[in-house]
Amino acid sequence: VHLTPEEKTAVTTLWGKVNVDEVGGEALGRLLVVYPWTQRFFDSFGDLSSPDAVMGNPKVKAHGKKVLGAFSDGLNHLDNLKGTFAQLSELHCDKLHVDPENFKLLGNVLVCVLAHHFGKEFTPQVQAAYQKVVAGVANALAHKYH
């Protein structure tokens, strides 16, 4: 991902304020609610029968935290996202058979959740930088599919 120095600063400054537990669970939960077909990858998570069930599900929250942990790692390696996400790409492609389009959906949901959490601080410039990052991460996660 090519970010200007200003974009890198915007991304890392905001990310330093993110509550990974809260935002991760909310982002994954929203993905599962807004795009219900993604729930098929989470059969072992128990009750996903309603938006309230999804958003309150401890397994969704725990996995969301894990997802954002990996995203955080990516932010530390923006110049090598494909290398950083190589193992996760392989896992999601070969073992889990996740449609790579879902990575884009989750990235866009994450941007919405960040905008909700940070309000006016999530300026159009910050959003543009995050859109670049989530697109780069989605591309890196889809790399094994190519």
UniProtKB/Swiss-Prot annotation:
Gene Ontology annotations of biological process type: hydrogen peroxide catabolic process
Stored InterPro entries: Globin (IPR000971), Globin-like_sf (IPR009050), Globin/Proto (IPR012292), Hemoglobin_b (IPR002337), Hemoglobin_oxygen_transport (IPR050056)
Modified residues (Phosphothreonine): 12
Molecular function per GO: haptoglobin binding; heme binding; hemoglobin alpha binding; metal ion binding; organic acid binding; oxygen binding; oxygen carrier activity; peroxidase activity
Modified residues (N6-acetyllysine): 59, 82, 144
Cysteine-cysteine disulfides: none
Binding residue positions for heme b: 63, 92
Post-translational modification N-acetylvaline, affected residues: 1
Residue numbers carrying Phosphoserine: 44
A single GO cellular-component term on record: blood microparticle
Signal peptide start-end: none
Domain called Globin: residue spans: 2-146
Tissue: Red blood cells.
Keyword Acetylation: yes
Post-translational modification S-nitrosocysteine, affected residues: 93
Keywords on record: Acetylation, Heme, Iron, Metal-binding, Oxygen transport, Phosphoprotein, S-nitrosylation, Transport
Domain of life per record: Eukaryota
The protein's assembly and partners: Heterotetramer of two alpha chains and two beta chains.
Similarity section: Belongs to the globin family.
Purpose: Involved in oxygen transport from the lung to the various peripheral tissues.
Protein name: Hemoglobin subunit beta
Organism: Mandrillus sphinx
Gene assigned in the entry: HBB
